[in-house]
From Swiss-Prot:
PROSITE patterns, per database record: WD_REPEATS_2, WD_REPEATS_REGION
Source organism (scientific name): Scheffersomyces stipitis (strain ATCC 58785 / CBS 6054 / NBRC 10063 / NRRL Y-11545) (Yeast)
GO MF: RNA binding; translation initiation factor activity
Signal peptide: none
WD repeats: 8-49, 51-89, 91-135, 149-188, 198-240, 296-335
Gene3D superfamilies recorded: YVTN repeat-like/Quinoprotein amine dehydrogenase
Stated name of the protein: Eukaryotic translation initiation factor 3 subunit I
GO biological process: formation of cytoplasmic translation initiation complex
Amino acid sequence: MRPIKLMGHERSLTQVKYNREGDLLFSVAKDNAASIWYSSNGERLGTLEGHQGVIWSIDVDPDTHLCATGGGDLAIKLWKVETGKCVFTWESPSPVRRVAFSPDGSRLLAIADQVMGHIGTIVVYEINHDDESLTNQSTEPSLVIETPQDGAKATVAGWSANGEFIISGHDDGYIYKYDAQTGEAVNSLEAHGIHTEEKNVTVTDIQFAAEDRSYFITSSKDKCSTLIDVDTFEILKVYKADAPMNTAAITPLKDFVILGGGQEARNVTTTAESQGKFEARFYHKVFEDEIGRVKGHFGPLNTVAVHPDGTGYSSGGEDGFIRVHTFDKSYFDFYVDAAEKNTEKSAEKA
């Protein structure tokens, strides 16, 4: 599984994202320009320039018509993918940590960070897709979800199926489910900080199952990742790692999940990958066992995205590189005998 190595950013990657078809890969980093790449060969299609600082998040709508970015320069920008032109900018009261289009592309959520005296909010904007009036977007959000005064700030968020709920992860390890129409909190769950003794339990990523968005995976600095059902809001599986996790994704076709993270570079005495645990980790989604690791980055993995058709994945690291992997035959041939596994589990319990 020899990857394509993309060198298009001057600083650490913050997010990589495929479009729905998987032919394009979008990336943002702690520099001030987003990049768009052909995922098949790594050729750069273009850059989106306009932010004045770090870009924390990027997302693309289902039709690959519009793209949104959120940054530390207190701006949410809307771009036309075909031309690379910024068509609209929303001002934010604080740095924007995450942007995400609803599944139908009609709405855009953004997390305004809880800093600079701002209490921290999740805002939702209605998106006008009319080509003739893309620059005419509503400046006021259609929904504002405020973090409770005594609550922890939201760090990541995403949409459930049909845009019915907004799921957010917070820096106290809790996950919240909000009604996407009213903003009312429907449910909450302590997903992190209960599986290990780690003090830092910040939720670092949320990604949904591609097929129906009925469940999602989280990652956290507590060295764990959890699989959670949207409907019941119960933890289905827990994947334990040996380093803080920054990102997690669910693979289609095969029952695997991919985790990425590693010790912060300043805490590592050598640059060896094994020393800092800078590998992408593959776990069996059902049995929770680690089944393999992929090396390559010389620093923590900050972001992982799986190709929509399940044929590969991309990772972005603290080292400033993107690695685009295509799975080989051994990946698809790998399988675990469920009956044998259940026998092992029974023996362990006995």
